[in-house]
Swiss-Prot record:
It comes from the Viruses. This is Putative ankyrin repeat protein R597. The keyword Repeat applies. The keyword Repeat applies.
């Protein structure tokens, strides 16, 4: 076997030991292999993906190789749903939560990285254990990234996690109480609706698009149940289309005390938008 072949063989063995979290064989071989930064990054990236906790701790404690940045490891351990990057959950010891516990023992500071992303991704996965662990370790900021409320429904609809964060003083930047209420209504999350009402949400603060989507998702009864004031729609009455509906709408009006034209506005919006 040539020298290069031997080096490549040993590198393959090291990768195998990292995947298996075989610390004994890893330590026996690592000193025999010249690890440049690129290969060190590769090994510790694999270790992060595989939740090879023994290997990672050894590398941190010895600085034997240049490792994948710690804050990037934590991103993998928390999970990146938008990119499909996750640490594997193999058993009670080799899993993403245990890896997070290990990583958070070390300095995770990186001035160029928004730490709010950790909490955002944990909440998006509805992973209460990860959310609690991050908050307990001082990560108490979450930024709701998108201005489109339908993209944040996974956060708003997790009202129990939202409650935990609020109760524990997390700074939730970009949080919109009306969008949170809307998300729970269209998801038929009655407990979430009740919670958001309790902390100040108002059904009549919903914007028109939210009202339309609630009707689109067959939740119009919820608007009646929560006493939405349909007559707020007066400002949209100057629309000739609203005069083209039959007498069936009058029956609806008689049963609900809603102005006919306001119902027409909603129906025309639904047809034009969806």
């Amino acid at each position: 076997m040539s020298v290069n072949d031997n080096i490549n063989h040993n590198k393959k063995l090291l990768e195998k030991y990292v995947i298996e979290d075989d610390l004994y064989n890893f330590t026996q071989l690592i000193n025999e292999v010249s690890c440049d930064d690129e290969f060190g990054y590769k090994l510790t990236t694999i270790a992060t993906q595989e939740a090879s906790i023994n290997i990672i701790k050894y590398v941190f404690d010895t600085d034997i190789i240049k490792c994948f940045p710690k804050h990037q490891m934590l991103r993998y351990a928390v999970g990146l749903p938008s990119l499909g990057y996750f640490t594997k959950n193999k058993d009670e010891f080799h899993n993403s939560l245990e890896l997070m516990k290990l990583l958070l023992q070390y300095d995770m500071n990186n001035n160029d990285f928004p730490i709010s992303e950790y909490l955002y991704n944990a909440v998006k996965q509805n992973n209460f254990e990860k959310v609690k662990l991050l908050i307990d370790n001082g990560i108490n900021s979450l930024k709701i990234i998108s201005r489109y409320h339908f993209e944040n429904k996974y956060i708003y609809n997790n009202h129990e996690i939202v409650k935990y964060m609020i109760d524990n003083g997390v700074d939730i930047q970009g949080f919109n109480l009306s969008y949170a209420l809307h998300s729970c209504i269209i998801s038929d999350n009655n407990d979430g609706v009740e919670y958001y009402f309790n902390i100040g949400a108002n059904i009549n603060d919903l914007d028109l698009e939210s009202v339309v989507t609630i009707i689109k998702y067959n939740r119009i009864q919820k608007l009646f149940d929560y006493s939405y004031n349909f007559n707020k729609l007066d400002y949209l009455l100057d629309n000739e289309e609203n005069n083209n509906y039959d007498e069936a709408l009058n029956m609806l009006v008689e049963l609900t005390s809603i102005k006919t034209k306001n119902v027409c506005v909603l129906l025309s919006l639904i047809m034009s938008k969806y």
